[in-house]
Amino acid sequence: MGKTLYEKVYEAHVAVAAEGETPILYIDRHLVHEVTSPQAFDGLREKGRQVRQVSKTFATMDHNVSTTTKDINASGEMARIQMETLIKNCQEFGVTLYDINHKYQGIVHVMGPELGITLPGMTIVCGDSHTATHGAFGSLAFGIGTSEVEHVLATQTLKQARAKTMKIEVQGKVADGITAKDIVLAIIGKTTAAGGTGYVVEFCGEAITDLSMEGRMTVCNMAIELGAKAGLIAPDKTTFDYIKGRKFAPTGADWDAAVEYWKTLKTDEDAKFDAVVTLNAADIKPQVTWGTNPGQVIAVDEPIPAPESFSDPVEKASAEKALAYMGLEAGKSLSEYKVDKVFVGSCTNSRIEDMRAAAVVAKGRKVASHVQALIVPGSEQVKAQAEAEGLDVIFKEAGFEWRLPGCSMCLAMNNDRLGPHERCASTSNRNFEGRQGRDGRTHLVSPAMAAAAAIAGHFVDIRDWK
């Protein structure tokens, strides 16, 4: 019987498979940031161990860096300590670090792909739940805990049981104005936020292969939001064209050999998945979350659902709680509610394509007077590219704040956050209670939808904007 893409990558990395034991996988790339690494390095130090493969380990600062200044003190004492500790640890253990003053600094899941650190067929881990982003390249990428970070630093391996497999196929082409973010939110709306639990997902279908690499990264980034361990997309010419010429990409004969191997990284026709989910791309409309998990999502032209519309008692109770927290009334349109803040950024939507999409909407318009709108590029490289294209000028003239790279308002670990009951149109990946600030209300949308909400002062259907 044939094998799935996941099975091919998984099996190629089994280093030890003792009977009755969880297999040990070799890890090709380990990405490190300031929040989940301090205790891991302390563990190495206490046990007298070194980092086994420094050439496969890359660190950056992203979670709590300020987006208004390069001052390491700007986000508070805890943030300063974490960043100073990362500098010390990387110096001591010989790990490459792109700190806040480096031209390659950025959100770890933006920085890795744009430098060619992320390549098809690799195993990639990071102490961060959205590591699945890198699966857009046909790599097996997933988040790990701090004790596992230490284990990978010390051994370049990790115990990892084989997951179940799920195929999510988005058939046909999407309508104009429908983005990767809309696709993945529609998927999660169908599967629910727990539908992928225990699975590694492969995204496929014409609507997926039509996406750019930036779009594919958006989709895989949110695989974790449907409960999956990881999400993969088979590499193709789009993938190879994106990688070629990047800093850590193979060159010459090595490139030719790599591409030949990468072309084998696809699910065999006779492979069997444990579960299959199918969506019709033409049915997908601009999506907006209304609740407190990404599965609580509707098309922008649909009314806010009533709890009674859910047959499952758990979903019904969750909907009641979410509506109360979000300050929403069932049956109303989301466009009836004012937004207070808008955030375009995060490892989901902070790449150059996302900046361009928001700029198209912003150009020649003005942010509503009651709205604070932040544009936070995902890396120094994205920021430089956007500025070379004049996007920063478009944003600033429209009344958006053009910020420095970092995770920013996605998780409120710096000073970018919501106040109590403030409503935010956000391009990030999680709308949990308090995620963007205590009692803050988060609605997940695409960059174009977020920019339009900033200008209108409330949610609008981007398809009506010309």
Swiss-Prot record:
Lineage of source species: Bacteria, Pseudomonadati, Pseudomonadota, Gammaproteobacteria, Vibrionales
Co-factor(s): [4Fe-4S] cluster
Subunit structure, interactors included: Heterodimer of LeuC and LeuD.
Stated name of the protein: 3-isopropylmalate dehydratase large subunit
PANTHER family reported in the protein's UniProt record: 3-ISOPROPYLMALATE DEHYDRATASE, HOMOACONITASE, MITOCHONDRIAL-RELATED
Example GO molecular function: metal ion binding
Signal peptide (residue range): none
Reaction catalysis annotation: (2R,3S)-3-isopropylmalate = (2S)-2-isopropylmalate
EC number, UniProt record: 4.2.1.33
Family classification: Belongs to the aconitase/IPM isomerase family. LeuC type 1 subfamily.
Role according to the record: Catalyzes the isomerization between 2-isopropylmalate and 3-isopropylmalate, via the formation of 2-isopropylmaleate.
Gene Ontology process terms (BP): L-leucine biosynthetic process
PROSITE patterns assigned to the protein according to its UniProt record, in alphabetical order: ACONITASE_1 (PS00450), ACONITASE_2 (PS01244)
Binding site for [4Fe-4S] cluster: 347, 407, 410
The protein's annotated pathway: Amino-acid biosynthesis; L-leucine biosynthesis; L-leucine from 3-methyl-2-oxobutanoate: step 2/4
Cofactor notes: Binds 1 [4Fe-4S] cluster per subunit.
Alphabetical keyword list: 4Fe-4S, Amino-acid biosynthesis, Branched-chain amino acid biosynthesis, Iron, Iron-sulfur, Leucine biosynthesis, Lyase, Metal-binding
Pfam family, one: Aconitase
Top-level taxon: Bacteria
Transmembrane region(s): none
